[in-house]
Amino acid sequence: KDFYVYYARMIETNKYLNLTGITDMKEVVVKHMIDSLSCYDSEIIKSGMTIIDVGTGAGFPGIPLAIYDRSLKVTLFDSLKKRLTFLESVIDKLKLTNCTILHGRAEDLSHQDYRESFDIATSRAVARLPILLEWTVPYVKEGGYVVALKGAIYEEEVKESNKALSILKATIEEIR
């Protein structure tokens, strides 16, 4: 039910605020909801973990993760206040007390308070992997994870990421 309420609110808001080009319910379920939940791995994600969803946009994957596992503490991070206003309305409607929002740009040093504060950083369709790593790794605690939901053509981005991985003292553990 919560996933449908989220979908309906997104489609209604999409009439005046461009949140997604995909509006057909079946396509939204497959391309947004299921894709977002594909990063949920119970071997990595444990009860009560903190997640920052960098460049959350319409809330993917953060909102589906927060609905699926209400023990997670999810911070939805985006640079566009209008999108965050939409997400606040979803959070209120669904009573997602495990969600908060953060306004700003990931690359800004003004978010020093949030550095190394999260168990996991997620991001979907935001930037090429080398840039994405620079924007997400600093927010993750030592021993934490960055989950980058990338498309089918990711190999080149992985190769381009070696310098960023070295500078950030990070490694790629798994690719699925």
Regions found by a protein language model. Give the residues of each.
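Conserved beta-strand elements of the Class I
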Residues: I52-V54, I120
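Class I SAM-dependent transferase core
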Residues: D2-I52, T85-L102
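Residue-level signal for inorganic ion chemistry
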Residues: M10, L65, K150
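Short, glycine/charge-rich beta-strand/loop segments that flank catalytic centers
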Residues: G55-G57, K81
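Conserved SAM-binding loop of SAM-dependent methyltransferases across substrates and taxa
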Residues: A58-S71
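S-adenosylmethionine
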Residues: L72-T75, S79-R176
